Curated annotation (Swiss-Prot):
<feature type="repeat" description="WD 6">
    <location>
        <begin position="408"/>
        <end position="447"/>
    </location>
</feature>
<dbReference type="InterPro" id="IPR015943">
    <property type="entry name" value="WD40/YVTN_repeat-like_dom_sf"/>
</dbReference>
<feature type="region of interest" description="Disordered">
    <location>
        <begin position="1"/>
        <end position="131"/>
    </location>
</feature>
<dbReference type="InterPro" id="IPR050505">
    <property type="entry name" value="WDR55_POC1"/>
</dbReference>
<feature type="repeat" description="WD 4">
    <location>
        <begin position="282"/>
        <end position="321"/>
    </location>
</feature>
<feature type="repeat" description="WD 1">
    <location>
        <begin position="154"/>
        <end position="193"/>
    </location>
</feature>
<feature type="compositionally biased region" description="Acidic residues">
    <location>
        <begin position="12"/>
        <end position="23"/>
    </location>
</feature>
<comment type="similarity">
    <text>Belongs to the WD repeat WDR55 family.</text>
</comment>
<feature type="repeat" description="WD 3">
    <location>
        <begin position="241"/>
        <end position="279"/>
    </location>
</feature>
<dbReference type="Pfam" id="PF24796">
    <property type="entry name" value="WDR55"/>
</dbReference>
<dbReference type="InterPro" id="IPR019775">
    <property type="entry name" value="WD40_repeat_CS"/>
</dbReference>
<feature type="repeat" description="WD 5">
    <location>
        <begin position="324"/>
        <end position="363"/>
    </location>
</feature>
<dbReference type="InterPro" id="IPR036322">
    <property type="entry name" value="WD40_repeat_dom_sf"/>
</dbReference>
<keyword id="KW-0677">Repeat</keyword>
<feature type="compositionally biased region" description="Acidic residues">
    <location>
        <begin position="31"/>
        <end position="48"/>
    </location>
</feature>
<dbReference type="InterPro" id="IPR001680">
    <property type="entry name" value="WD40_rpt"/>
</dbReference>
<protein>
    <recommendedName>
        <fullName>WD repeat-containing protein 55 homolog</fullName>
    </recommendedName>
</protein>
Length: 498
């Protein structure tokens, strides 16, 4: 290590006094001349750099010390480390490396135009070693796998109800502001066809007629509107169709439909007439759902006050009313060749009635222990139910079995529907989203017998093929399969060679 022995500190007064004044003057003159020469040289170098010339190499210049200015004796620290020390060399090397990294980053940023938010496109390259990894192979398979259902639809407004068109790949979405959005759906993309402004208040139910020619909507504004799907114009307006807000509609055929309001009134309508065919009020609370069977002789209504009420359409009077239940009856469906009616409740129970015997249920299934507000028949023996827990569950009717989870939402599910082929389910939640689930696998579902052993706990949590979640048992099954394949491999395991 070199030391600065040729420099004196201001405290060495005796030695400083011995210096010859002429020598001091000469040294000062030489320093001033060197400063002037270096200043001229630096200006020439920077002028050349500005003109595009390369920065000159100063390694061969013995007078160059790497500093922009000369330090005076006043700033000298006798305890400072020598610039020629190993530490200072490391610092300079580190500084140069950092500067190089900064320059490289700047050049990379300069690839984009000034002010542009465009980022360099990322490439996903896989070498042979990557492709042998199980996770990477699974990712590649997922990317290449074609979609089996349309992508999600997201709206700004709350979705109150959804309905599939009976003949075309169109789905209607009713909103809380009274509009209806018509989307054409496809596995690759969804297309908004048009938005129809139909009601001044929340549109609570939307239905297509059996032939798909007309779109029926009811609202909190107490009106029923019929829109022509071809002309997109209003076909008929039933103004003040009810004295209270209308909650639900049910289409019987191409001409007849029924409506139910918040006060328990049920009305039957004919599109060819201006007024209702008949009106019955046998309930005191909201009508939650209306339905019929294929013969359409009886009209059934569930209500929030815990009654199942049946009306004789031809006689225009009440047929029978069930015993009261201490829970809301929210939804229902017809199964087993129109021989069974199943009703879902606010306590998560499923009640079964023999057709025509609606006074009291013949069977009860505890269900999912979460409020059931929606139900749609998928096949003659399989129903999908949904509610506040955000899960769509499939269950087998008579005997009752939880088949598993069809799909999930992050929030409570508001509406549920199945398309005409029975292969696609759509659901909307409080998150203003519509999701699609391919349930074609139910076509090959086998018969369930009453005496078959089953695990109700596992069945309730089992994820079906349409679910976005996988089963833990599937993961361990894959591991078991890999172990079995390894055992069959003649190259695996210890050698039997003698």
């Amino acid at each position: 290590m070199h030391t600065h022995n040729n420099f004196k500190t201001p405290s060495d007064e005796d030695e400083l006094d011995d210096l010859d004044e002429d020598m001091v003057v000469g040294v000062i003159a030489e320093i001033e001349q060197e400063v002037l020469n270096e200043s001229d040289s630096d200006n020439d170098e920077y002028d050349l750099v500005d003109m595009g010339a390369p920065v000159p190499d100063n390694d061969g210049d013995v007078s160059y010390d790497g500093n922009d200015s000369i330090s005076s004796d006043d700033s000298f620290d006798p305890n400072a480390a020598d610039s020629d020390s190993d530490d200072s060399m490391l610092d300079e090397a580190g500084g140069g490396s950092a500067g190089g990294a900064t320059s490289a980053k700047k050049r990379k940023d300069d690839d984009n135009p000034s002010g542009s938010n465009k980022q360099p496109e990322a490439t996903f390259d896989l070498d042979e070693d990557d492709e042998t990894d199980e996770t990477v192979r699974a990712m590649i398979a997922a990317i290449k796998k074609p979609r089996s259902s349309p992508p999600e639809i997201k709206l700004e407004d709350f979705i109150t109800d959804i309905c599939f068109h009976p003949d075309r790949d169109i789905i209607a979405l009713a909103t809380i502001i009274g509009d209806v959005h018509l989307y054409e759906y496809d596995n690759e993309a969804n297309k908004l066809l048009r938005t129809i402004e139909v009601h001044s208040k929340a549109c609570r139910d939307v239905e297509f007629t059996e032939d798909g020619r007309f779109l029926l909507t009811c609202s909190k504004d107490k009106c029923v509107m019929v829109t022509d799907m071809e002309t997109e114009k209003l076909k008929k307006l039933y103004e003040t169709a009810h004295d209270d807000a209308i909650n639900t509609l049910h289409v019987l055929n191409e001409n007849l439909f029924a409506s139910g309001d918040d006060a328990g009134t049920v009305k039957l309508w004919d599109l060819r007439t201006k007024n209702a065919i008949f009106e019955l009020k046998e309930l005191e609370d909201q009508i939650t759902q209306l339905t019929t069977n294929e013969q359409s002789k009886l009209l059934l209504a569930t209500s929030a006050d815990g009654y199942l009420t049946t009306f004789n359409i031809s006689a225009r009077k009440m047929y029978v009313q069930s015993e009261p239940y201490e829970e809301e009856l929210n939804c229902m469906g017809v199964y087993r060749g129109d021989s069974k009616l199943v009703v879902g409740t606010s306590k998560g129970r499923l009640y079964t009635y023999n057709w025509g015997q609606f006074g009291y249920h013949c069977d009860m299934y505890p269900g999912i222990k979460s409020p059931i507000s929606l139900m749609i028949p998928i096949t003659d023996r399989i129903a999908c139910v949904a509610g506040e827990d955000g899960n769509i569950r499939a269950c087998h009717i008579a005997p009752y079995r939880n088949l598993g989870v069809v799909g999930q939402h992050n929030m409570p599910i508001e509406s549920l529907d199945v398309n005409a082929s029975g292969e696609l389910i759509a659901s909307s939640s409080h998150n203003n989203d519509v999701r699609f689930w391919n349930v074609k696998y139910f076509e090959d579902f086998g018969e369930i017998k009453y005496n078959e052993k089953h695990n109700a706990y596992k069945e309730q949590r089992h994820n079906l093929p349409s679910s976005k979640c996988s089963n833990t048992s599937d993961f361990f099954a894959d591991l078991t399969k890999e172990d079995a394949d390894g055992d069959d491999d003649p190259c695996a395991g210890p050698s039997n060679m003698s």
